[in-house]
Amino acid sequence: MVPLVEIKDIHKSFGDLEVLKGVNFSVNEGEVVCLVGRSGSGKSTLLRCINLLEKPDAGTIRVFGEDILHTRDVNAYRAKVGMCFQQFNLFNNMNVLRNCVYPQQKVLKKSREEAEKTAYQYLDHVGMREFAGQSVKTISGGQKQRVAIARALCMNPRLMLFDEPTSALDPEMVGEVLNVMRDLAKEGLTMIIVTHEMGFAREVADRVVFMDQGKIEEEGTPEQIFEHPKSERTASFLRASVNK
């Protein structure tokens, strides 16, 4: 099986700070991979490299069989890769429905009628259809993140990237977003998720990847990582996470 995502020897620095130090990993179609690790370990930078929001200094990234670092059409590539950020990145001057419709019209060249039909379908999927006419300024953080997920799904992505999607939410709103992501995992959507939600990673991930100091320290099934970590750094991180 050819991996959907294949990353080889990725390096990335910001000035004198080397953030990624030769990262290698792959993701198969339909797989859910959770990236975990301390803040500053390189998780989010790796995710941003996959979506070409950052360009690596060295190495190769192949997604859908394509060398994306030399793609001629970044927008066409990004249309196939959904991404949800910590801070939602919604259009605050638009209502909920328009947030989901506009990208379809702009990138996929859909008619308004077709785009609205798709938007309602995915807003319904994340439990936000009744808020379609509301300004995004008036809804909660958890609701904003669900709209952001719906917006990404409207583009019919083959791959979804989540960069700590619950970190900016109040604790009582975390569950509603994780429930949507659980449903997506059950539907077989390929997902790479940067998360500090260890219980969620343990429950949903097919594979957990622990990053430390810009490298992959250890990876395995949730049972292998959480029950039988081989690395002392992994074990130390997990102990600290449980004791928070």
List the model feature ranges, each with a label.
Residues V36-R38:
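The feature captures the beta-strand-to-loop junction immediately N-terminal to the Walker
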Residues N51:
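Helix-to-loop junction immediately C-terminal to a conserved catalytic motif
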Residues S135-I139, Q143:
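Conserved ABC ATPase signature
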Residues V101, R112-F131, N179:
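Conserved ABC ATPase "signature" region
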